[in-house]
Amino acid sequence: MAVNVYSTSVTSDNLSRHDMLAWINESLQLTLTKIEQLCSGAAYCQFMDMLFPGSVALKKVKFQAKLEHEYIQNFKVLQAGFKRMGVDKIIPVDKLVKGKFQDNFEFVQWFKKFFDANYDGKEYDPVAARQGQETVAPNLVAPVMNKPKKPLGTGSAGPQRPIVAQRTPATPKGGTGMVKKAAGDDESAGLIEQINVLKLTVEDLEKERDFYFGKLRNIELICQENEGENDPVLQRIVEILYATDEGFVIPDEGAPQEEQEEY
């Protein structure tokens, strides 16, 4: 039977998003790039097979699930494994299958603690266990590449098209013009793809920032509600919350007001 883990609080043992993905990819030999890709449930099923061989029907797991109902089916397999091994944890399937960062990140943080409490270090071949299939669902990757779509890319190249159209009548050889245009399109497509990747990276970092900021804000509210109790522990927490780096200077609140008066 499994060792249950009930703590869900944020501690220094919690991994960051990047470290969590690195652990998952290394353990299961995957190439996940986003926490949201865990919404298919397939990775959790394989981790259960690693911890407790035979606890889940791995043949029923759809490692290349594309649709929400397929994700739900995978989580049903996981729930059956939890029940079989006595894992006292309710899986928020409805939230996880939506692919939201915060819900999936909270669950995988718990699962990592559960894994550490039950893993005995035995060898496991994840590729052979899933018969060589990858768990990155195509529809989870496709929106990332198609999100900007080609119309956005052609918008930046729009000013160049009239120039090409004006030069075409003057040049007797239209074929060379087409070749140059194709080469330019390829270069533009490459740059646009790089921009899109950077935008997605920023988006992920902002989600992670907001996630932890929300937790810090909740802690701050709890401390403020119990401010009059003179609890040394709460006072210490408040000191940590409001502590600043050495040399940090709080901006002068009067400066913005002076700028407003000038207008």
Curated annotation (Swiss-Prot):
Keyword field contains Cell cycle: yes
Localization (cell): Cytoplasm, Cytoskeleton; Cytoplasm, Cytoskeleton, Microtubule organizing center, Centrosome; Golgi apparatus; Cytoplasm, Cytoskeleton, Spindle
Cell division listed as a keyword: yes
GO biological process, one term: attachment of mitotic spindle microtubules to kinetochore
One Gene Ontology molecular-function label: microtubule plus-end binding
Domain Calponin-homology (CH): 14-116
Domain of life, per lineage: Eukaryota
Pfam families for this protein: CH (PF00307), EB1 (PF03271)
Gene Ontology annotations for the cellular component aspect, listed alphabetically: centrosome; cortical microtubule cytoskeleton; Golgi apparatus; microtubule; mitotic spindle pole
Annotated ranges, domain EB1 C-terminal: 180-250
Record keywords: Cell cycle, Cell division, Cytoplasm, Cytoskeleton, Golgi apparatus, Microtubule, Mitosis
Function in brief: Plus-end tracking protein (+TIP) that binds to the plus-end of microtubules and regulates the dynamics of the microtubule cytoskeleton. Promotes cytoplasmic microtubule nucleation and elongation. Involved in mitotic spindle positioning by stabilizing microtubules and promoting dynamic connection between astral microtubules and the cortex during mitotic chromosome segregation.
Family in the record: Belongs to the MAPRE family.
Name of the protein in its database record: Microtubule-associated protein RP/EB family member 1
